[in-house]
Amino acid sequence: MAFVFYCFLQVLVSWVIHAVQPFCLPECTCSEESFGRSLQCMSMSLGKIPDNFPEELKQVRIENSPLFELSQGFFTNMSSLEYLWLNFNNVTVIHLGALEDLPELRELRLEGNKLRSVPWTAFRATPLLRVLDLKHNRIDSVPELALQFLTNLIYLDISSNRLTVVSKGVFLNWPAYQKRQQLGCGAEFLSNMVLSLHNNPWLCDCRLRGLAQFVKSVGPPFILVNSYLVCQGPVSKAGQLLHETELGVCMKPTISTPSVNVTIQVGKNVTLQCFAQASPSPTIAWKYPLSTWREFDVLASPIAEGIILSQLVIPAAQLVDGGNYTCMAFNSIGRSSLVILLYVQPAQAMPGLHFLSTSSEVSAYVDLRVVKQTVHGILLQWLTVTNLAEEQWFTLYITSDEALRKKVVHIGPGINTYAVDDLLPATKYKACLSLRNQPPSQGQCVVFVTGKDSGGLEGREHLLHVTVVLCAVLLALPVGAYVWVSQGPYNFSEWCWRRCPLHRKTLRCPQAVPQCKDNSFKDPSGVYEDGESHRVMEEDEEVEKEGIS
C-alpha cells in the first residue's frame, strides 16, 4: 500500500511540475536566466518566425535556420523582448514595420545573414536599442542620417560588408555623439561609442576624404574596433591604409579636346578625342545626330588618376556623319559636356549617296528602306539629312500598276516611318520620297513586288518580295533587297547587265553602290522572304519604260 501511494505521489508531482512549466516551441529550448526567460532555437527547419511565441520572453535566439525575412507582425506577442539574436540565417529583407512591436528591444544581432540594405527608419520603434550587430552581410551603403532614430545606440558593427563609400556625417550625426557635444564637461559620465568598419572593400577616392579624416582623429568617445581600413580601389591605392592615404577634394568633370573643329574628306577614317578630368573618376558618353542609325566604337583609357581619354572611332566617314558630336562626362558630383563639330568634305563623285535638290539650292540626303512586313502591308523607314538648319517637310508618293491614282502623303518634321496597308497580291509598287512638294522623279524610290496570295492571312505574311527593277533605283536599295540581288539566280553584274541596256557593255552599273557596305548602318529588320524564287519582270519594254519615268 505504501508503494502504491509513493507512485501516485510521483505522478502527481510530475503532473504539477509539467502544468506549471511554461510552453516552449518544438525544436527549441526554454530557460530562466538572470535577466528573464530565454528561448533558443538552433538549426530549426522553420522558414519564418512562428507566431505562437511564448509570452514574457526576454531573449530570443534563432540561429542556423532557413529564416528569410522579418515581416510586419512577427513579434506581436513579444512586447517585453529585450534581446533578439538572429545570427547565421538567410535573412535578406527586413520590412519597414517588422520591429514595431518591440519597444523594449535593447540588442539586435543579425550577423552572417544576406542583407543588402537596412530600413533605418524602422528603428523609430526601438528607441532603447543599444547594440546593433550587422557584420558579415552584404550591405553596400549607409545613408548620412541612418542613425538618427537610434538615440541610445552605443555599439554599431557594420564590418565585413560591401561598403565602398561612407560619409563621416553618418557618425557625426550619431545621437549619442550629439548628446556628448551638448553636455560638454558632463559627458564623461556617458558610455563610449564602439564602432566597427573593417573588412569592407573601401574605394579610396575623394568621397572617403571625410571618413579618412575621422579615422585619423578618432578618439573618445569613439572607439574603433579596428582602425586599419584597407583600400581596395582605385588601382593606384589598392592595399593602402585609409588613414595613410592622401585624398583630394571632389570636383565635377572638366572636359577638353585637341580640336573642337574637325574636317576630313569623305570616306576617310576619323577619331574624335575627349579628355575628362574629375574626382571621383568620370564616366564618359557620346551623343551625335545619327546615333540611332550609325553606331560607332568608343574606346576609353585612363591617362592618369582621375583623367580619362575617350575616343569615338568613325570608319569611312560619310557626308551624313557631319554635325555636332557631344562628349558628356559625369560623376557623383556633377556633369559637363563639350561639342566637337565634324565637317565631312564631299568628293568629286559620290557613288552610293542620293541627294534631292531644289531650285533654291536646298538638298537632302535620303535613305529609304522597307524595314518590316506585316500581315496587311509593309513599313517604310527613312533617314534624311538636309543642308538647312530648319526642319523640312517631305512628300511620299506610292503608286502601283493597279491603282488609278497615286497616293500622296505629306510627312512633317520628326517623322521617319510610314505603314503601307492593304497591298494587293502579285502587284508591283513604287514608293518615292521627295523634298517638300517636288515631283517623285526628283526623289529616292524603292520598288517592291508582292507575291501571290497563297491563302488567307497566313499566306499574306509571306507575300512580299522586295525587288529593285531599275539600276538607277539601286541608289535606294534596301539591305534586304541587296541580299536578294546578291543571292538570286543572277549575280549582281549579270543582273545589271540584263536590266540596264545602256550599260551592257560595261557589265556593271556604275551608280549601283549598295549602302551599308561597311555595316555601320543599323538595319532594324530585314524583309522576310517566302522561299519562292524571285522573278524579275519579263518584259524589257516595261523595265525601260520605268527607267524613263
UniProtKB/Swiss-Prot annotation:
Disulfide-linked positions: 274-327
Residues making up the signal peptide according to the UniProt record: 1-22
Pfam families, A to Z: Ig_3, LRR_8
Name this polypeptide is given: Leucine-rich repeat, immunoglobulin-like domain and transmembrane domain-containing protein 2
Gene symbol of the encoding locus: Lrit2
Record: glycosylation sites: 90, 261, 491
Keywords assigned: Disulfide bond, Glycoprotein, Immunoglobulin domain, Leucine-rich repeat, Membrane, Repeat, Signal, Transmembrane, Transmembrane helix
Species whose genome carries this gene: Mus musculus
Domain LRRNT stretches: 23-54
SMART domains in UniProt: IG, IGc2, LRR_TYP, LRRCT
